[in-house]
């Protein structure tokens, strides 16, 4: 094989790397940034004008029963990797796998420690998604948790149901997919409502203190 025989495949390799490795990928990134800037950046969620996002609309976070700090929030689906976006994988345990039965029983026990409308736990609350970091639950799974969240936060059930309606996404084009509730979006609404309650309580305490001191 002479140099001329090698030149053709090497030139083809170089052109392919340039076109498909740089130009094609670069053009897709440029188009994505121009047309879908939020989606191309990972659909980050910002609150209160912070520079750092609190999460992503497309990647779930660990809101789970068994974590005391999450009792006042809506729980997300189980995750095999603690919602680590660097390792997208589920356990793929089959229905006869004893490890799956053990994990589901533990989830059901944690859920049953708090107020529930009935014993029919929605499957979303005890089953992983295929990626193991699904950011959504079904409306039924969210509504099942309203009683607990209302009792833990003091937010009325009516207002919580309104939050669920606001956080519910419809099927794409009304056809593909199912109705789904973004857990992070819903919990940010709960957090805002709790902050409003705290501000109201603080103002009430200040007014009561002023009255007691004879300022009014």
Swiss-Prot record:
Induction details: Up-regulated in response to K(+) limitation. Induced under desiccating conditions.
Main location: membrane
A GO molecular function held by the record: P-type potassium transmembrane transporter activity
InterPro entries assigned: KdpC (IPR003820)
Transmembrane segments: 12-32
GO CC field: plasma membrane
Membrane topology: Single-pass membrane protein
Highest taxon, organism lineage: Archaea
Pfam families registered for this protein in UniProt: KdpC
Location in or out of the cell: Cell membrane
Biased composition (Polar residues): 197-207
Alphabetized UniProt keyword annotations: ATP-binding, Cell membrane, Ion transport, Membrane, Nucleotide-binding, Plasmid, Potassium, Potassium transport, Transmembrane, Transmembrane helix, Transport
Keyword Cell membrane: yes
Region entry Disordered, spans: 197-216
Effect of deleting the gene: kdpFABCQ and kdpFABC deletion strains are only able to grow in the presence of K(+) concentrations above 60 uM.
Family: Belongs to the KdpC family.
Subunit organization: The system is composed of three essential subunits: KdpA, KdpB and KdpC. The complex also contains KdpF, a small non-essential subunit.
Function: Part of the high-affinity ATP-driven potassium transport (or Kdp) system, which catalyzes the hydrolysis of ATP coupled with the electrogenic transport of potassium into the cytoplasm. This subunit acts as a catalytic chaperone that increases the ATP-binding affinity of the ATP-hydrolyzing subunit KdpB by the formation of a transient KdpB/KdpC/ATP ternary complex. The Kdp system is essential for growth under K(+) limitation, and for survival under desiccation and salt crystal inclusion.
PANTHER family recorded: POTASSIUM-TRANSPORTING ATPASE C CHAIN, POTASSIUM-TRANSPORTING ATPASE KDPC SUBUNIT
Protein name: Potassium-transporting ATPase KdpC subunit
């Amino acid at each position: 094989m002479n140099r001329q025989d090698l030149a053709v495949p090497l030139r083809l390799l170089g052109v392919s790397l340039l076109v498909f490795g740089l130009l094609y990928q670069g053009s897709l990134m440029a188009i994505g940034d121009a047309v879908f800037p939020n989606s191309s950046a990972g659909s980050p969620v910002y609150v209160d004008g912070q520079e750092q996002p609190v999460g992503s609309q497309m990647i779930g976070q660990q809101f789970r029963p068994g974590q005391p700090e999450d009792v006042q929030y809506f729980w997300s689906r189980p995750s095999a990797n603690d919602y680590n976006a660097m390792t997208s994988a589920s356990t793929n345990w089959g229905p006869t796998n004893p490890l799956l039965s053990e994990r589901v029983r533990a989830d059901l026990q944690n859920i049953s420690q708090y107020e529930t409308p009935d014993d029919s736990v929605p499957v979303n609350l005890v089953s992983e998604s295929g990626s193991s970091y699904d950011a959504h639950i079904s409306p039924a799974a969210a509504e099942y948790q309203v009683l607990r969240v209302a009792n833990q936060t003091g937010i009325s059930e009516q207002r919580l149901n309104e939050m669920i309606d606001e956080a519910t996404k419809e099927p794409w084009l009304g056809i593909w997919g199912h109705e789904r509730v973004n857990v992070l979006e819903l919990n940010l609404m709960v957090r805002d409502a709790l902050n409003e309650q705290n501000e109201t309580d603080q103002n009430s305490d200040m007014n009561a203190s002023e009255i007691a001191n004879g300022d009014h």
